[in-house]
């Protein structure tokens, strides 16, 4: 049947969506239809402990060729709460057996505090427990421009106290994970997994920046904050009361 469709000249949906050429032979990137793509992920241990509203917004506003992908997976409360309780009890037992001058002591103390915080938030504040995975996609027309943009993203993440890792030898899997198929590669998911509660997840909502972009507007310039075009149509009566809004 496939040969008949091919000989008959029929075009399927897969033919329209699939790229014409894919080069997977490089460690640092993948080339899809002559566009270079590279991917990074925020390590599971690489997040800030306390975050504010719009804490992912700087990555969304990173400029041309930078895209953000994040995945959330809600966990059942009846399974998570017992696990947190057991882990906290185990850490308390281990803490009694080590001296307070060892580095392990501070790590266990931090783990116990985190466990108690999560239990309190879930029991008293009715928050839900999620696993979050964050990937950053970078694209460019050349390998040199791609490397420049990757370096800029790494510098930006360092300023946000985020630890990012490149998906070396896994850019094909990362590219597949970036497609709207709700399928994250298990190896990347394992390295990028971070637990998060409802409030912090809501604060990750990235669309917090302002923009002015009328479809038939006149270009006034570029937004310095997120590199978006500033375009205003002063004669659009449905948006503005007077055409002399800008002089």
What are these regions (language model features)?
Residues 1-209:
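Extended, folded cores of ATP/NTP-driven motor/assembly subunits in large transport
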Residues 215-247:
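Glycine-rich phosphate-binding loop of nucleotide-binding enzymes
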Residues 198, 203, 207-214, 222, ...:
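Generic structural "secondary-structure junction" signal
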